[in-house]
């Protein structure tokens, strides 16, 4: 859903288990590439960093998974790691309404919103504290976007 609303081609990391015959081809056509979860998938991480360094767009879900309730969860500790290695801007985004697909509605309303970019500091090292502050800022902006959608804005 996010990729169809973005003004540029978006690529995604998706769990390797989804890349079975036929379905895997569809995911690749939609811009996804596999990542082995629960470990350090160096090839997938390198692919993501290289994509960002070449000014491509990589969408990640900072919580590490989808929300079944529609509520915003806590960001995973490494949510900004690839962007920090590439010094790529972070564009907060939210998708609201996909949690109702399972309820049985035929055409649920889904909204996608993009926020203003967050940039890594140019004149200071990217420390754990900088990453934590940027992650907190990103999650706060996503929460604002989500609240705006839920309030009809």
Language model segments and positions:
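Non-catalytic C-terminal accessory region of glycerolipid acyltransferases
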Residues: 43-153
